[in-house]
A protein has these predicted regions:
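Flexible loop/turn and low-complexity linker elements, especially glycine-anchored beta turns
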Residues: 2-10, 41-62, 85-108
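Aromatic-glycine hotspot motif
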Residues: 1-35, 54, 58
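Functionally engaged cysteine thiol sites
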Residues: 26, 30-33, 42-44, 79, ...
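Amphipathic alpha-helical oligomerization segments
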Residues: 17-24, 45-80
């Protein structure tokens, strides 16, 4: 399923960018150090929230991808559950629709 693979790759790249950029929200008066653009165990709420959200999004989309792959391996091609899982994946991609790598076929 190349469309699922392309969408997963697109989402992974966007989330990697968000993880990297989370350090930009590090507060100046926080005693925790920022090293090489990464937030390392500080008490700033914003970077932690960004990183937690990205981790949760990754977990949900990974579960959706596994469901699609599992059903495909069993010979079920785009069952109702797979279609629903793919719609969830496309919904996670929607906030990035202005990115040059966005594909219109990903619109939920």
């Amino acid at each position: 399923m190349p469309v699922v693979t392309r969408l997963m790759s697109f989402l992974g790249d966007r989330w990697q960018e968000e993880q990297r950029d989370a350090a930009l929200f590090h507060e100046f008066d926080c005693p925790g150090p920022v090293q090489a653009g990464r937030v390392s165990r500080c008490s700033c709420p914003c970077p932690a929230q960004i990183l937690d959200r990205v981790a949760t999004d990754r977990r949900i989309v990974r579960d959706c991808e596994q469901r699609i792959r599992r059903e495909q391996d069993r010979g079920l091609c785009w069952s109702v559950e797979s279609v629903r899982a793919f719609q969830v994946m496309k919904a996670f991609a929607l906030p990035y629709e202005l990115h040059p790598g966005w594909q219109e076929s990903w619109r939920p």
